[in-house]
Design a protein with these regions (language model features):
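Noncatalytic regulatory segments and standalone regulatory/sensor domains
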Residues: 28-35, 61-73, 77-129
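Cysteine-nucleophile protease catalytic domains, especially the papain-like/related folds used
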Residues: 1-53, 63-66, 72-77
Length: 129
């Protein structure tokens, strides 16, 4: 199963919307390399979930409504579903449920560093009525 499609399925389930992999695949434009963040965003929009994506700092993830989809290791997508006491709880389509401390989390997620700021790519989601 492709990680982007699996992440879409997980967040839809969280919001009480259960869709099969086949159904999601109809909307999600996939290539041999998987799906893009744009394709994930367009797919969830089609099924009633608004998104905002961008580069954010780790400390901003503590203040947002979860779950959110993260670009992981520059080539994978995971769902961040909880942050508690500097522990980051990840639903990884390849590994299952995994817990990371701050440093481990940053190794996988941070994609840019400049002027002392470390940022990674996140997609925040909100269901529409």
């Amino acid at each position: 199963m492709q990680c982007g499609i699996a992440c879409i399925q997980m967040v839809c389930c969280y919001f009480g919307r259960k869709y099969s992999t086949e159904f999601i695949s109809q909307y999600c434009h996939s290539t041999t390399e998987g799906v893009s963040l744009l394709s994930i965003s367009e797919t969830v929009k089609e099924i009633g979930i608004k998104t905002i994506s961008g580069r954010v700092e780790t400390n901003q993830l503590v203040r947002v409504i979860l779950p959110c989809i993260l670009h992981w290791n520059q080539n994978h997508f995971v769902v961040l579903y909880k942050v508690k006491k500097n522990r980051f709880y990840i639903a990884d389509p390849a590994k299952g449920l995994v817990k990371y401390n701050l440093e481990e989390f940053k190794k996988h997620w941070v994609s840019t560093q400049s002027d002392g700021e470390e940022k990674g790519i996140a997609m925040f989601l909100e269901p529409t009525p």
